[in-house]
UniProtKB/Swiss-Prot annotation:
Lineage top rank: taxon: Bacteria
Subunit structure: Part of the 50S ribosomal subunit. Contacts protein L20.
Species, as recorded: Latilactobacillus sakei subsp. sakei (strain 23K)
Protein name: Large ribosomal subunit protein bL21
One Pfam family named in its UniProt record: Ribosomal_L21p
Purpose of the protein: This protein binds to 23S rRNA in the presence of protein L20.
Gene: rplU
GO cellular component: a single term: ribonucleoprotein complex
Amino acid sequence: MYAIIKTGGKQYKVEAGQAIYVEKLTAEAGEKVTFDQVILVGGETTKVGTPNIDGVTVDGTVEKQGREKKVVTFKYKPKKHSHQKKGHRQPYTKVMIDAINA
């Protein structure tokens, strides 16, 4: 059985026992999280929500919080002796999917 959930403005296809990386959640490592915005549940039969399916949740456990690799941007203006270098590291949360409650 699989489900498509929505969190952090993105959609993820998940199955029980799968680890996913999502946008940063406020939960700490070891805490349980519940995703209630389930868009689709598939398996023997497929159920599609409009926009969400009522009464269906996906449970998971936060494994760790982290930050992705640095992305460097560089702006340069020729003949002006002007340049700007910036770096950004996006925070993420690693979640282990425990169960799909359909």
